[in-house]
Amino acid sequence: MKKFILSLSFLFIISTISHAQQLTDATFQHAVNACLSTNPVDGLCTNSQYGIMPDWDVSQVTDMTSAFSRDESFNADISNWDVSNVRSMERMFFRAFDFNQPLNSWNTSNVVTMESMFGVRYFSSNVPIDYYREMSFNQNIGNWDVSNVFTMKDMLSGLKAFNQDISDWDVSNVTNMSWMFGKSFNQDISDWNVSNVTNMLGVFYDAISFNQDISNWDTSNVLSMKLMFWRANSFNQPLTDWDTSNVTDMSGMFYEAISFNEDISGWETSNVTDMGGMFEGAISF
């Protein structure tokens, strides 16, 4: 009987501890701030009521918006987090310049927004204000399930070295792909289903390394291609078959895209209202 009572007491204690360590939307950001106030780099805040950050139970958290935004030195290993219920990762690592930990095991199947997830820029009237410092993250995230994501605006633009294979991403629900890629990205994304994308504003803005075949992209719903290949210095791929019938803005599209010299004479541009500076500085065209 005594052993039975002791066993019940032990189970109660364990249950209480486990419950205390489980974070919710109401407690998550407070826990992050408290932990990083004492251990801003590795999150090994042993005095936290939730334990050290790598071991946190975040399985009930749905909103991780701006979780580590502007935590410039943050670089904790959070690879084992259960993020299966998270819906927003918007600005999650915004200007977390030093973060470079593996996240490939994350279950992102319920995420709907990854806007500025690894971004560094502020925007003024939808024009980026570039920042002198870029982010370190360059990990494999190719097996992420992004099938429910609708916005990837500015998602990877702040990454100075990111050049990972994300060819298998299902982007069929994405509508906003503006300002998406960074300087080093040059991977095959030819099979992406972009048929629902309406905004390609600056998608390869300053993506100086990118030179992949995207001729088969379904661009029939795109409204803006403004600044799309702005200073994409390496890009020179055929775009002849693109459906541009709904595009209204092509201003600055190939601005200083110094390598581009492809035939786009067959494009339907009857709905375009702005072509200002479309080929300015495109010296090969």
What is each residue range found by the language model?
Residues 17-285:
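Negatively charged
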Residues 4-15:
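Sec-dependent N-terminal signal peptides
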